[in-house]
Amino acid sequence: MQYLQPLSAASQEVKTEQTKLAELAGRKVDYQVQDKHYELKANEMLTSVRYIDGKYQFDTAALKNKINEINQAQATLGKTFTFTTSTGKTIQVPGKTYGWALRDSDVIASITKAYETGKPSLNAVNDIYGIGYLTYGTGYDTTLNGGLGNTYAEVSIADQHVWLYKNGQQVASIDVVTGKKSTGEDTPTGVWYIMYKQSPSVLRGSSAGSGSYEVKVNYWAQFTNSGCGFHDASWRKNWAKDAYISDGSGGCVNVKPSEMPNIYNNLSQKEAVIIY
């Protein structure tokens, strides 16, 4: 059996560890999340630190708590949005796929690496995530309108109407037909986002009582994981205000072919789609 002599406090290895720990304890990172800055001091964010065999070992419990605090204050993923409609009503709309949040593991990796290397500042843009088609989050680049921004699509089920806004200016206001209420195929309410656009496109799916379908459309902009989106509906004859009740779509927002080009051209990937 080999006996290892315990290290003395005066050994070079112990001195190196002490120096490394002292250097790290004095470091701090200016962490920017959107328009806010957080000074994250290593001696406050790291509950304990060890330096063994040339590597740091961190207890990041305090940093995790700080991440949660920032998410509570700023993140929009899964939150309920306060929204003022085009008709002047203030309503609450639950967040669905739209939004962003800080991912604990990514933030911890970024901050601890910055502590190790002495990097003084970081932007959280690389540490966020989202859900749905775009897993890196949506809406991080704006704090306007409660995080919804000033470029968005608004859909009123009761009014069977769509409004589009671009940089705060209304660029479209049209009547539409949404999902069939009588069969439970209502267009899903909540705050979504434009996942992608395609022109032309072939839509495939099924609807209650009609079986499966495959239909070509000239313009398609999807906003839910389940396959709902905006599209032209050349086959539709009934555009009445109450058509959606018993003659609605399978969940999509049907737009008149003559009006769909303007809708398509004024929708952008990642923008919020607010449906109520």
Label for each model-derived stretch:
Residues K64-N65, K79-T80, T189, G205-Y276:
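Exported/periplasmic cell-wall-interacting domains
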Residues M1-V215, L267-S268, I274-Y276:
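Surface-exposed, secretory/extracytoplasmic low-complexity segments enriched in Ser/Thr/Asn/Gly/Pro
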